[in-house]
Structure formats: structure tokens, C-alpha cells
UniProtKB/Swiss-Prot annotation:
Gene Ontology MF, one: actin binding
Protein name: Sperm flagellar protein 1
Protein's job: Microtubule-associated protein involved in the stabilization of microtubules along the axis of migration during radial intercalation. Promotes the establishment and stabilization of an axis of microtubules required for the active migration of cells into the outer epithelium. Microtubule-associated protein that promotes microtubule bundling and stabilizes microtubules against depolymerization in response to cold shock.
Intracellular or extracellular location(s): Cytoplasm; Cell projection, Cilium, Flagellum; Cytoplasm, Cytoskeleton, Cilium axoneme; Apical cell membrane
Assembly mode: Homodimer. Interacts with actin, TJP1, CGN and CDH1.
Distribution of this protein across tissues and organs: Expressed in the intestinal epithelial cells (at protein level).
Native source organism of the sequence: Homo sapiens (Human)
Length: 236
């Protein structure tokens, strides 16, 4: 979530977020990041002077969430040459599943790229120690490494297994680079796919119900036919 980010990319994203100290327990990515506060904390973790946390108010209301995201877009993301379109911000604020991931993945790449440029010649980044407690990897996310090359969350290079990385379609690469139009298209296509899957499931249930009713009718017809034959024999 290519029309969605694949499992390995999500796996790496959750590992990355789990290694960043955040002010809230980590339960559900779409809800946790919906008001923009944790996104500001992630950026502040990399660049403390870039973010003033008092500008971001934890919120449940859509209006305040959009206000937080708007301020983050204008004052912080702009300095990273990064932007989240208004319609994508609204989807994130509404906790639409699978949308915030499409922002966090390219944002992570932008943060690590900028940090590498600032630390050129200073050696590799210091390894982040995993936090105690639960994280996104502990709340039902079970992924399998596919043997593909994935971005190294510490050095920005490639982690490789036995097999070389599979080639990515151009649309997938453009989405991971933060192309706003592709971010929105991917989010919309994912929602359409989920809706289609739900429709198929409902139709399958209806088919099974009709098959069951047909079986009951056949049994009833056989029973009535048998009784009719018995009555005819008695009359003779």
C-alpha cells in the first residue's frame, strides 16, 4: 500500500515508529497519528529545533486535527520540501485506514535523507534502542520478510536477504517519493478495493443463504411427494 504499500514496507515502517519515543501508547496507527501531534513528535525527534510542540494540541475534533495538520504543513513540512494535500489531511484526520502510512513512508525517507546530509563525515547514525512496552509490531501486525531489499531504518541503505529486491512499478516508486496525486489515488483505490471485497462477501453470504433455502425446499417437496404417494396407495 502497486495500489497499496506491501507488507514488508509496512513492517519496516512499524519498526521505525516503534523505535521513536512518543508521548502516547502505540495502539492504532491511523488513530494515533490522526491529529498530527505524533507526526510533529517524530520530526522533533530528528530535528528538535524545527518543531515547537506547544503549537500542536491533542484533539478528537476534526477541526482541531485539521488545524494541527495545517500548521505542520506550513511551518515544518515546508522546510523539508514536503507537503500533504488538503484532501489527504482530511482523510488522515478522519482516521481513514491505510492513508497515514502513505505519508509516513516518504516522510521517513525525507527525514533520514536530510539527517544524512547534515551528518556526512560524522559516521553512521547511532542505533536506536527499542522501547519497552507495546508498539505497532505487538498489536496484530504479523508480517513475513519476503527476501526483498528494504530501506535500512538506520543508515538509509539497503538491507538485503538471500534474494535481490524485486523491481517496483513506477507508480509505487512515485508514491513512496511523496507525489501527492499518487498518495491520494492510492488511498482512494485502497478504499475502493476494501468496499469491493465487502460487497463480494455480502453476495457470497446471500448465495449460500439461497442455496440453503433451495435445499430446504427440495426436502419439503420430496416429503410432500412421498405423502401424496402414500395417500394414493391407501385410496386404492
Amino acid at each position: 500500500m502497486a495500489s497499496s504499500v506491501d507488507e514488508e514496507a509496512l513492517h519496516q515502517l512499524y519498526l521505525w515508529v516503534d523505535n521513536i519515543p512518543l508521548s502516547r501508547p502505540k495502539r492504532n496507527l491511523s488513530r494515533d497519528f490522526s491529529d498530527g501531534v505524533l507526526v510533529a513528535e517524530v520530526i522533533k525527534f530528528y530535528f528538535p529545533k524545527m518543531v515547537e510542540m506547544h503549537n500542536y494540541v491533542p484533539a478528537n475534533s476534526l477541526q482541531q486535527k485539521l488545524s494541527n495538520w495545517g500548521h505542520l504543513n506550513r511551518k515544518v513540512l515546508k522546510r523539508l520540501n514536503f507537503s500533504v494535500p488538503d484532501d489527504v489531511m482530511r482523510k488522515i484526520a478522519q482516521c481513514a485506514p491505510g492513508v497515514v502510512e502513505l505519508v509516513l513512508i516518504p516522510l521517513r525517507q525525507r527525514l533520514e535523507e536530510r539527517q544524512r546530509r547534515r551528518k556526512q563525515g560524522a559516521g553512521s547514525l547511532q542505533e536506536l534502542a527499542p522501547q519497552d512496552g507495546s508498539g505497532y509490531m505487538d498489536v496484530g501486525v504479523s508480517q513475513k520478510a519476503r527476501g526483498e531489499g528494504v530501506p535500512d531504518p538506520q543508515g538509509g541503505g539497503q538491507l538485503s536477504w538471500d534474494r535481490p529486491p524485486a523491481p517496483r512499478p513506477p507508480a509505487y516508486n512515485r508514491a513512496l517519493q511523496g507525489d501527492p496525486s499518487f498518495v491520494l489515488q492510492i488511498a482512494e483505490k485502497e478504499q475502493e478495493l476494501l468496499a469491493s471485497q465487502e460487497t463480494v462477501q455480502v453476495l457470497q453470504m446471500k448465495v449460500r443463504r439461497l442455496e440453503h433455502l433451495l435445499q430446504l425446499k427440495n426436502v419439503r417437496i420430496e416429503d410432500l411427494s412421498r405423502r401424496l404417494q402414500q395417500a394414493e396407495r391407501k385410496q386404492r
